[in-house]
A protein has these predicted regions:
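Residue-level signature of the transmembrane alpha-helical core
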Residues: 5-6, 51-56, 60, 86-90, ...
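Membrane-interface helix/loop boundary segments of multi-pass membrane proteins
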Residues: 61-87, 114-121
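Juxtamembrane helix-loop-helix connectors linking adjacent transmembrane helices
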Residues: 1-58, 76, 146
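Short, Lys/Arg-enriched, Gly/Pro-containing loop segments at transmembrane-helix junctions
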Residues: 179-184
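Membrane-interface starts of transmembrane alpha-helices
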Residues: 46-50, 54, 76-88, 121-124, ...
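Hydrophobic core of alpha-helical transmembrane segments in multi-pass integral membrane proteins
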Residues: 7-14, 158-178
């Protein structure tokens, strides 16, 4: 199961690159981005609170809802697993209510959904979600930027390339390790 952490980190880097392409200025995006920045600045004043909320409570509650109830419920009702994973990831993305987090949450929700489907346990998605949120909270509170690649002083395309490689290799190894055999 250790392959899921590089897989998650890879998706985080890919997502970070894609989210960086969403405008933060303009008639629509500018005021929305300013509101979100102000809200996060206000939240960031309570270090213990932000870690408690984002690293402990959110992963636990959100994974129960989106993977444990929505995704599992759809699969139990006969929806194909791929469609259930996509739908629960989309709902997870929309739940985050702003374009920057929606894209990120959707993509990460895909990884969380696959991991939940393959492991049949909420523990791994909760740990991955906490891992993602810990990195985000740490960068928000301690970094110059919320971007992993910016904090490492790397061009964003390096982050994308590393992300794709990490995601692809670890996804392949995870799927190979967790393949399902059918008896005839």
């Amino acid at each position: 199961y250790l392959m899921i952490f590089p897989m998650m980190l890879g998706m985080m880097l890919v997502s970070e690159f894609l989210v960086s392409k969403i405008p933060i200025e303009g008639e629509f995006f500018g005021p929305l981005y300013d509101q979100m920045s102000d809200a996060f600045s206000t939240i960031a004043t309570d270090t213990a609170g932000i870690y408690l909320l984002t690293v402990l409570f959110a992963p636990f509650l959100e994974e129960i809802l989106f993977r444990g109830i929505i995704q599992k419920g759809l699969i139990n009702k006969g929806v194909k697993p791929a469609k259930a994973i996509i739908f629960s990831a989309l709902a997870f993305g929309i739940f985050h209510l702003n374009p920057w987090q929606t894209v990120n949450a959707f993509l990460l929700g895909l990884v969380l959904g696959v991991v939940y489907y393959k492991t049949k346990s909420l523990l791994m998605p909760i740990l991955l979600h906490a891992f993602n949120n810990f990195i985000s909270a740490y960068l928000l509170l301690n970094g110059n930027s919320e971007s992993v690649t910016e904090n490492l002083h790397l061009p964003e395309y390096y982050g994308l390339i590393v992300g794709i490689v990490l995601l692809s290799v670890s996804y392949y190894l995870f799927m190979y390790r967790n393949r399902i055999y059918y008896r005839e």
